[in-house]
Each structure stands twice: as structure tokens, then as C-alpha cells.
UniProtKB/Swiss-Prot annotation:
It catalyses: 5-dehydro-4-deoxy-D-glucuronate = 3-deoxy-D-glycero-2,5-hexodiulosonate. GO terms for molecular function: 4-deoxy-L-threo-5-hexosulose-uronate ketol-isomerase activity; zinc ion binding. The gene is kduI. This is 4-deoxy-L-threo-5-hexosulose-uronate ketol-isomerase. The lineage of its organism: Bacteria, Bacillati, Bacillota, Bacilli, Lactobacillales. Belongs to the KduI family. PANTHER family: 4-DEOXY-L-THREO-5-HEXOSULOSE-URONATE KETOL-ISOMERASE.
């Protein structure tokens, strides 16, 4: 088992005006999220979110972080969200085991001492996408089946953005310290997500793109200020960090899905500032 946690530092809008393609990818793109038998995480200084992939195969896996966070155990001062995008598996949370099929989610509150991830079949392993944010209070652990996610249809075929937003961890459904997490699926024939674009100065956000309709599908993710945009080309199962001051949207060569996760000082989902289309550059 390999464990690796990369670090991404925070940048101002002025910084990325001077980034070339290589530098932009180094600072905002996570190219490898899932690797069989491994835990691959990224710590971003944007609101101190930790995110990444856990892929257990023959053996179960546990995230063990202490000195790196200045604590005795990983979730001593953090909460955790999980969504499985792979084969069937399970999570054991302080001794309580829950089955996790594809698209199932789980919220795990501050103070939980042990979270163990396992796959039912090593040949078809679970792929647990995990997101952790700082916490100040303990909220109950809760399994979040896909069937119970709050579905919100958005967009239309004319604008190539027909999609469904599935809210797993959302202030309208459950209490958390600051974590919000969900899953957006674009319909065949649609390619744009989050367009028209917006920003939310009180929350940062990560996007993890996956379930590409074709092997050669690519997504061009847009970030930066609305008048100074940049793009990053993403492959399947890659993630990008979006600072709170940045737009965050993308267009694919075919349809796809992505997991979004947010944290910051405001949990109101609709607390955002729309960007007029004529402002984009």
C-alpha cells in the first residue's frame, strides 16, 4: 500500500495571470486520484481542504494522519465526506460496518477515530472519493444512499447544459460544520457544466471529473477571474482546485459526471454571484 499526500498552495488572481500551461496544471490539477491498493490525497491551503482517492484491493485501507495535521488522529478536528464511484465495497466507522455500492455516500463527523475502507472484489475494487474539511463540532455519522440524494434538474438541451445535480451533503438536508458535497451528471448531448458561470467568495470548491462517455473524452475546465480566464484540459478521474475568487465551469467533448465539494464560511448553496456572459474573457 502506498500513501501519498501532495500539497497545493493558495494563489491570488494576479498570480495566475502569469502562469503558463505547465505551471497552471502544477498548481491546480490533480492528475492521479485513484490507484489500485493506494491512498492518494491532496492538501490545499484554500480553506484547508483534503481530498483524494482510496482504492482498497486485497487489503483494507485506513487514512492515518496525525503529525501532518498536528493532531492525534485524522478526524480529531475534521469531518469527512465519501462517495464511491467504483465497485461494491464497505466502510467501517469506529466498528460500524456499512455496505457501499457505486454512488453511495457517507458523512463522518469530527472525533471519529477509525475509518476503514474495503472492496468486495479486488478485481472490481471500490473507488472511494474522499473530502475532509476542518470542523469545530461533532455531527452524527450518516450513510447517504444515492437513492436519498436530493436531485435538482438543471439546464436544457438548447444550451447544451442539461444535467442533474445530486446533493449528498447539503445544509438543507443535514448539519455539518462546513462541508458540502454532491454529484452532477450531464445528459447525452450536453457538454457544459456550471454555465452561465458564477463565483462564491465565501467558499472554495473542488471538481473531480469522471465517468467520461468515451475513452477519448476530454473536459476543458475554466478557472480564473471572469475577465482573465484560463483553461485546463482534464482526462478521466482527475480533479481541479477552484479558489473562492475563481469561476469554475467546463465543457466536454462528450457528456461526463463530476463530484463537487465545497467548504468555507457560508453553507448556503445559493450564496453565489452570477457572472454575466458578456463579462467573460
Amino acid at each position: 500500500m502506498a500513501f501519498h499526500m501532495a500539497t497545493r498552495y493558495a494563489h491570488s488572481p494576479e498570480d495566475i495571470k502569469h502562469f503558463d500551461t505547465t505551471k497552471l496544471r502544477q498548481e491546480f490539477l490533480m492528475e492521479k486520484i485513484f490507484n489500485a491498493g493506494d491512498i492518494l490525497l491532496t492538501y490545499t491551503y484554500n480553506d484547508r481542504m483534503i481530498f483524494g482517492g482510496v482504492v482498497p484491493t486485497e487489503s483494507s485501507l485506513e487514512i492515518k494522519l496525525s503529525k501532518e495535521l498536528g493532531v492525534d488522529f485524522f478526524l480529531q478536528c475534521r469531518e469527512l465526506g465519501v462517495i464511491n464511484i467504483g465497485g461494491p465495497g464497505s466502510i467501517i466507522v469506529d466498528g460500524d460496518k456499512a455496505a457501499m455500492v457505486k454512488q453511495d455516500g457517507y458523512y463522518i463527523g469530527m472525533g471519529t477515530k477509525q475509518v476503514v475502507f474495503a472492496s468486495d472484489n479486488p478485481a472490481n475494487p471500490a473507488k472511494f472519493y474522499v473530502v475532509s474539511t476542518p470542523a469545530h463540532k461533532t455531527y452524527p455519522n450518516k450513510k447517504l444512499p444515492f437513492a436519498n440524494a436530493l436531485a435538482k434538474p438543471m439546464g436544457d438541451q438548447q444550451h447544451l447544459n442539461k444535467r442533474t445535480i445530486y446533493k449528498y451533503i447539503d445544509a438543507s438536508q443535514m448539519a455539518t460544520c462546513q462541508l458540502q458535497m454532491g454529484y452532477t451528471v450531464l445528459e447525452p448531448g450536453s457538454s457544459w457544466n456550471t454555465m452561465p458561470a458564477h463565483t462564491h467568495a465565501r467558499r472554495m470548491e473542488t471538481y473531480m471529473y469522471f465517468d467520461f462517455a468515451e475513452p477519448d473524452t476530454r473536459v476543458l475546465h475554466l478557472l480564473g477571474e471572469s475577465t482573465e480566464t484560463r483553461h485546463i484540459a482534464l482526462f478521466n478521474e482527475q480533479a481541479v482546485v477552484n479558489p473562492s475568487w475563481s469561476i469554475h465551469c467546463g465543457v466536454g467533448t462528450t457528456n461526463y459526471a463530476f463530484i463537487w465539494a465545497m467548504c468555507g464560511e457560508n453553507q448556503t448553496y445559493d450564496d453565489m454571484d452570477q457572472v454575466p456572459m458578456n463579462e467573460l474573457r
